[in-house]
């Protein structure tokens, strides 16, 4: 399977997955685990076999496909339900007719990407973008902008990309060219630009044009501040990886990404917590109606806090992060209404920072218009994770043994913990895990792909 998966990706820009679990650059063991995971997504809890997915993959390889995203697990399920005696080859050809024979038929230049800032989110975005390079007609990481911190700054930046205490080693190779201030990661040449002024850089001198710039610094959060980037030659659009202020659109992919217009030059990808809770809130509101509720986030500490007690402009934030639980504020409840206006005025929110470096939890305490049961709402959310437009945002787990570190590297915006669900008629309490670093970064990339118009069609329909 691995050679076919790789060939389809490199030659056809076809991304394969099994019920949302990506197969690109995965080991044999990881692919087998993805097949076994599928039992949580099958109606009869049956395990998915490579003997079922491989024939579909082989048939795909013979169709000269154009760019597409194909879920092999769902293809198997649809073939079982709607095959009607057809051969695998005929079924796959009919299902993928829209892109069959279109290899290189929609040749695009791709979209240049500049990361302005290279902290926790910036480095994870870099990893994801490098991983998704494919044939080069999607998002292409071209440059990173930072302030120079030391004489050996480039070496240190490369080391931080190569090694991560939470997310593990970089999957590939990184070489350094100090003379030209470039990094080469898995064959991708990345220019490192040193600057303290966002409006002073001419990106075109590095061959960058019509680029999408991602501001990871959080220093500017309104249109005026972020508009400085648009004054630079080579920059066409800007995405902020923090809640936006003023009239900026706060986009949560899967919820309101269709609001992104061709004229939108600056948008916000909201916060990690907003991305985690809004998809689940929308699912619940659509089915049961939300009267009101409270959102409590149990959030890992961040770089904004102190290792030991020291001054901080925020209340309690100056106290030692590794030693304390810290009650603080969150704007997620208010921000949720920006992405989902039907929730305006219905939610309150608060946060507790805890001594863990990554993975957080949102506790949604909701009063519903329609009464339900624990079993019913869990099954509904399970179905939403499997067969809805929110399947990339909502994941679902039903185990009494999972803990926070089990969700490091989750690519979903949030994961509903079914075993923790509490329900009493019209009142429900839902527990949603989320990787506040990597899961959020995946959401940011989805917003970037929509803004750049490089999202391939997804199959099966």
From Swiss-Prot:
It holds the Pfam family Gp_dh_C. One of its GO terms (molecular function) is oxidoreductase activity, acting on the aldehyde or oxo group of donors, NAD or NADP as acceptor. It comes from the Bacteria. InterPro entries: GlycerAld/Erythrose_P_DH, GlycerAld_3-P_DH_AS, GlycerAld_3-P_DH_cat, GlycerAld_3-P_DH_NAD(P)-bd, Glyceraldehyde-3-P_DH_1, NAD(P)-bd_dom_sf. Keywords: NAD, Oxidoreductase, Phosphoprotein. The keyword NAD applies. Its EC number is 1.2.1.-. The keyword Acetylation does not apply. The modification Phosphothreonine is found at residue 421. One of its GO terms (biological process) is glucose metabolic process. Belongs to the glyceraldehyde-3-phosphate dehydrogenase family. PANTHER family: GLYCERALDEHYDE 3-PHOSPHATE DEHYDROGENASE NAD(P) BINDING DOMAIN-CONTAINING PROTEIN (PTHR43454:SF1), GLYCERALDEHYDE-3-PHOSPHATE DEHYDROGENASE (PTHR43454). This is Glyceraldehyde-3-phosphate dehydrogenase-like protein. It comes from Pseudomonas aeruginosa (strain UCBPP-PA14).
